Amino acid sequence: MRNLYLIRHGKPQYPDEHSYCIGQTDFSLSMLGHLQSVLLHGELDDKITAVYCSPLSRAMETAAHITPDLPHITISDLTERNLGEWDGLSFDEIRKRWPDIYEARGMNPDYPIPGAETPFASGMRFSQAIYEILRSSEGDIAIVAHTDVISSYLYLLDSKQHARQYFRLPCGSYYHLNTDDNDHVVLSDLTYLLPHPDLHDELCRMLRDSVSLPHHVQAHSDAVTELACHFCDLLESHGYFFNKKLDSLRSTPSRYCQTSKTSHQNRW
């Protein structure tokens, strides 16, 4: 049995505050998208032996964060569904230009988009890519792709139980699937997962570095952390006990720290 992680890329950077229909339109990750990808690294990096991804920038950038020490293998058939005449347009513009189709899709999300690849075609394309990847690889692997092709693929495997929209997943989340001894994908718990890794020092630094803070901001952050830890050392020498690395990041100290202060206030 092998583990297969189907991951949706981190949140992309849109041109403005509007929401966009971005099938194969190539947007890079936003600041939040980079942070989401580093959290995926914290959760999955030591669990996988290879990572495959869509050729779109938002997927490749996510894959690079997840396994910085492993090359990510780009597979064209893992790309997002082509959304035809709507691809790359804001939903406000789509609503104005195709009001009837927009309304129809509000009732039926699979109502055809002009010129778009069908969900079935994109699901079959993605399914064939998964088959080839499993056939030519070993160990536990991650696939970094997109919500539409992932949901279309899972719907093909489980259409008797759920509608296709059931399988859509938020940016920076993933499905954890397994294979049988013949490398056939086995569906069990089909609940998407959000990463919740332990926030150790190295991961916190990776989160900070992923958003490319200006040097002076980064230096200020380091100086504040150093000073906060110095204050914590001073307090600990007078009987206060708490986790200085975590409490220095909180606006309000932990309850354990407050309790310690009350019980040791006479030791000053």
Model-identified regions with their sequence ranges:
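Acidic, low-complexity terminal tails and accessory targeting/binding regions
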Residues: 1-2, 75, 81-93, 155-211
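Loop-to-helix element that buttresses phosphate recognition and phosphoryl-transfer chemistry
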Residues: 8-61, 113-126
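Phosphate-coordination/substrate-recognition cap region in phosphate-metabolizing enzymes
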Residues: 38-102
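Short glycine-rich phosphate-binding loop at a beta-alpha junction
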Residues: 48-55, 140-144, 245
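Active-site-adjacent alpha-helix immediately C-terminal to a catalytic or transition-state-stabilizing loop
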Residues: 60, 68, 127-184
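Short glycine/proline- and acidic residue-enriched helix-loop micro-motifs
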Residues: 101-121, 207-212
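Active-site flanking loop/helix segments enriched in acidic
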Residues: 199-223, 256-267
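Divalent metal-dependent catalytic cores for phosphoryl transfer on phosphate-bearing substrates
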Residues: 237-268
